[in-house]
Each structure stands twice: as C-alpha cells, then as structure tokens.
C-alpha cells in the first residue's frame, strides 16, 4: 500500500503490528484520536534545540500520556525497509526533530 495514498485520507499516526523482519513496530497512518493503545505520542525536548517523539501507550488507568514520567514511553526513530526510510519504535538513536517558528 502506498503511503502517499494513505496520507490523503488518514492523518492520525498509530503504531502498527510487530514486524519480525525488522524486529520492531512501524508507525502508520490510520489511527484514531484518543486510541490509548496505539495512537498516543508526545514530543519531549532532547537538547537545547532538538526534540524527540515518544510513543506512550497507556498501560493502566493510573497512566497518563501527558505525565512527566517517560519510563513507559518508547522512542521513535528511523529504520530502513526496502530502500526507504520508515518511522518505527527504536531502542537507540531516536529521530531528533527541530521546530522552526512560522511568522
């Protein structure tokens, strides 16, 4: 399925099923707002100018995706699949993002 076609209709990210060939889970479009098990992400500052994207699934009724405690969150990074770069959950080397204020 072409990602460009999915982005036209679906704009909510989610974590897909485990991909054994990559050893991780890829990010996909087609999520649902408020879907606690696969669509809760947050942005955290990683350096003076950079930010990381974290996937923070709710594991119990006591957990909250907006909490300051990131111990239950997983990092989002880049993996290579069939010559293409894909966003995925990673153990190390998270993708560092920079944001520029639009004027």
Swiss-Prot record:
Disulfide bonds join 56-73. The record marks 25-26 as: Reactive bond for chymotrypsin. It is found in: Vacuole. SUPFAM superfamilies: STI-like (SSF50386). The keyword Cell cycle does not apply. GO terms for molecular function: serine-type endopeptidase inhibitor activity. InterPro entries: Kunitz_inhibitor_STI-like_sf, Prot_inh_Kunz-lg. Inhibitor of serine protease. May protect the plant by inhibiting proteases of invading organisms. Belongs to the protease inhibitor I3 (leguminous Kunitz-type inhibitor) family. This is Serine protease inhibitor 4.
């Amino acid at each position: 399925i072409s990602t460009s076609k999915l982005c036209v209709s679906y704009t909510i990210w989610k974590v897909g099923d485990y991909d054994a060939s990559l050893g991780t889970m890829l990010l996909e479009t087609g999520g649902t707002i408020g879907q606690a098990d696969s669509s809760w992400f947050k942005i955290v500052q990683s350096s003076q100018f950079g930010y990381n994207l974290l996937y923070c699934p709710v594991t119990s009724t006591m957990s909250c995706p907006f909490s300051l405690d990131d111990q239950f969150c997983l990092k989002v990074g880049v993996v290579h699949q069939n010559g293409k770069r894909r966003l995925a959950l990673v153990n190390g080397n998270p993708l560092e993002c920079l944001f520029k204020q639009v004027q």
